[in-house]
Amino acid sequence: MSLKINVRESGNVVILDLIGRITIGEEAASLRDTIKEHLDSGQKNILLNLAEVSYIDSTGLGQFVGSFATVTSRGGQLKLLNLQKKLQELMQITKLITVFETYTNETAAVRSFAGAATAG
């Protein structure tokens, strides 16, 4: 199963609903390209909804880190929503859980961007 990306907006936050697998090849490239398109159009607050991600490999994790660095360097924020149990464990093992803000509630995640915007 390839990666499908549904794009929604909530206020000034772009929510990317990811469905499928994030692996080496087209899937990781598609995620990178989608994030870059939104950054290029001035949308800097990005929330990745991972509720329906069935599998992620090391390339997928690397894509998260690369995207985080790109978004941050352009004055934005990238946050994660609805990590599945296996991904949550993987993020803890790799210590990436300390890099990303993660949420289980979409409303709280979207509101967290508003707090950051007023602080900057």
Locations of the language-model features?
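Amphipathic alpha-helical interaction surfaces in cytosolic regulatory modules
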Residues: 22-100
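Non-catalytic signal-transmission and effector/linker regions of two-component phosphorelay proteins
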Residues: 1-9, 114-120
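Acidic phosphotransfer microenvironment of two-component signaling modules
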Residues: 85, 107-108
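STAS-typified acidic loop motif
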Residues: 5-33
